[in-house]
Amino acid sequence: MASTMALLVALVAMAGVLVSMPACAMVRHDYAAALSKSLLYFEAQRSGRLPPTQRVHWRGNSALNDGADHGVDLTGGYYDAGDNVKFGFPMAYTVTMLSWGVVEHGARMAAAGELRHALEAVRWGADYLVKAHAAAETLYVQVGDGNSDHMCWERPEDMDTPRNAYMVDASHPGSDVAAETAAALAAAAVMFSARAPGGDRQYALRLLTHAKQLFEFAKNHRGLYQNSVPSAGNFYHSSSDEDELLWAAVWLYIATGDEEYKAYIAGAGNLGGSGQPLGWDNKHVGAQALVAKARYIINH
């Protein structure tokens, strides 16, 4: 899935060796090539109208009417692995992890000649998540139907399966996916706020506005999203919203320094988490790592 590939991008960058190892090494690992191919994957997963910079030339425009059933523009974003469905929950986690990778290791990505591609990958996902946040308390979390999609293997350019859009709102909450989307946009805002090549402070402020609204939406209307969108739960069943709310608060604090997010983190009753590894359904380890790097959040 795309979220797994995002984690791979971060891990490759964290390896810290983006050029060939010395000749005396017994094993040679070309991390630059691994990073390049990992990022190229996201271009192959693009939905919507493709840009002139598209490097995967065997892909074409697809799903150009997404959102039409609700009168909104939901074109763009990423397909999920081999599916033609756009699942908002793992897509948001993917954007968060890609952004984190750039925030921590953008210099190494630049040295490998891949920073621009990483920035483009984040922006492609973030642009879609902004579209999906159609109103302060409305978030579209899925386009397409997983069951019918899995029964019909076809190129996205040719697909004829249903493209229904599904949303969460105040009456049909999804605090887990709303908080994860808040985390994604806040993390992307941190990335684009950087005074570095590819920085875009105006864009970062726009992302941050959506992130703040989504966090408030998630806090004020608690409920797991599969109860509102059962078809999503058949494929990405959420176990809790506590980790996403904490994860979002940490990223929003990093992005803004606002005391309200610090207070939320300090008051979180489950900072320790469940001991599960970091993944699209469990963010406790990621939140712990970020808080540990900035432990004054809790102590001051």
Where are these regions (language model features)?
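N-terminal signal peptide
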Residues: M14-H29
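Classical eukaryotic N-terminal signal peptides for Sec-dependent ER targeting/secretion
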Residues: M1-A13, P22
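Glycan-recognition and catalytic cores of secretory/periplasmic carbohydrate-active enzymes
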Residues: M26-H300
